[in-house]
From Swiss-Prot:
It comes from Rattus norvegicus. It is found in: Basal cell membrane. InterPro entries: OSCP1. The gene is Oscp1. Signal peptide: none annotated. This is Protein OSCP1.
Length: 379
């Protein structure tokens, strides 16, 4: 497992979340000023300096449930509210989109180009906010600094770590089904056409070399596909042609997107013990979430500003039906964490929590550990 996977996972899933929210904000005719505020607030929180400092520290991936909690907090960083069914659908769309992109990356290193495509599109949402653009550019700089010198083997390990994280997710997405890139069982269709990875020859020739490295024989074979050579490599600079289209906004055509549980996904969920049994890493995940969420400096509006509810379904009835029909094993509504009273750890977490503005409820006279668990209950 690579300890450099988390930033790529978080940024790409966050980019997909913004694509979906932007599409739904437009579909529901939310006023432009409110829609811009929602996206600006979420992006500003997502690229907050303290948050990214914690994010880029070498660390292993945690459970889907722990990461889901972070995105739930992130999606509600502004005046917009999502109910449980819409949040479930949002997370399903995010994860399946990025899983598809990781599967189709021509080279393991190209997951970095996918990330840059997301960052490029995110900057398009905040063109009138130079301060937030600077935050995104600073994250780009961190990415190039950390990942620019990694070997092909290290990128392969990152890709394998991502695929292991996604391996039990087989949720059907209407866009993928219509484009015939996903089967009815929720599994993706790998193409046998298109450009090969940069620097790789089109398949069809086998060369045999002797012990001196000289070619002594050449044979041709039919590969059964329709491959072409890549005309150029995507740019890894701040500005440039990424060439690769994976990670761009697939909702720009403004078509409704639906998700459905496949039988495979339901069966996988029933076997996923992390959702129904106590998590042995609960204490570590609590610390992880406290550090990440503690870095989310969410700014509440100074004056009274009415919020609104966003529905990721066409109608309220569909949303209610989705909430009732979703398998219980796939619910992320409750995270149960049992933390022991370790004095040094409690003091450290309490210090982190002091940096996190809690304005929803008045402070109560409780212990530091209880304050932290109460915060987790309110997520």
């Amino acid at each position: 497992m690579s300890v450099r996977t988390l930033p790529l996972l978080f940024l790409n899933l966050g980019g997909e979340m913004l694509y979906v929210l932007d599409q739904r904000l437009r579909a529901q005719n939310i006023p432009g000023d409110k829609a811009r505020k929602v996206l600006n607030d979420i992006i500003s929180t997502m690229f907050n300096r303290k948050f990214t400092e914690e994010l880029f520290k070498p660390q292993e991936l945690y459970s889907k449930k722990a990461l889901r909690t972070v995105y739930d907090r992130l999606a509600h960083a502004s005046i917009m509210r999502l109910n449980q069914a819409s949040m479930d659908k949002l997370y399903d769309l995010m994860t399946m989109a990025f899983k598809y992109q990781v599967l189709l990356c021509p080279r393991p290193k190209d997951v970095l180009l996918v990330t840059f495509n997301h960052l490029d599109s995110i900057k398009g949402f905040i063109q009138d906010s130079p301060t937030i653009i600077h935050q995104v550019d600073e994250t780009f700089r961190q990415l190039t600094e950390i990942y620019g010198s990694l070997s092909a083997g290290e990128f392969q390990l990152i890709r394998q770590t991502l695929l292991i994280f996604f391996q039990d997710l087989h949720i059907r997405v209407s866009t993928f089904l219509k484009d015939k890139v996903q089967n009815s069982n929720g599994r993706f269709v790998l193409p046998v056409s298109g450009p090969v990875p940069w620097g790789i020859e089109v398949p069809g020739v086998i060369r045999v070399f002797n012990d001196k490295g000289d070619e002594v024989k050449r044979m041709e074979f039919r590969h059964g596909g329709d491959y072409v050579a890549a005309h150029k490599e995507g740019s890894f600079e701040l500005y440039g042609d990424r060439v690769l289209k994976l990670g761009t906004n697939m909702y720009s055509a403004s078509r409704p997107v639906e998700t459905h549980m496949s039988a495979t996904s339901k069966n996988s969920a029933s076997r996923a013990q992390e959702n129904i049994a106590p998590n042995p890493l609960a204490k570590e995940e609590l610390n992880f979430l406290a550090r990440l969420i503690g870095g989310m400096e969410i700014k509440k509006p100074s004056g009274p500003e009415p919020g609104f509810r966003l529905n990721l379904f066409t109608t309220d009835e569909e949303e209610e039906h989705a909430a009732l029909s979703r398998p219980e094993e796939l619910s992320y509504e409750v995270i149960s964490i049992q933390a022991t009273q370790d004095q040094q750890r409690s003091e450290e977490l309490a210090r982190i929590m002091e940096e996190f503005e809690m304005t929803e409820q008045p402070e109560r006279n409780t212990s530091k550990g209880d304050d932290l668990l109460a915060m987790m209950d309110r997520l």
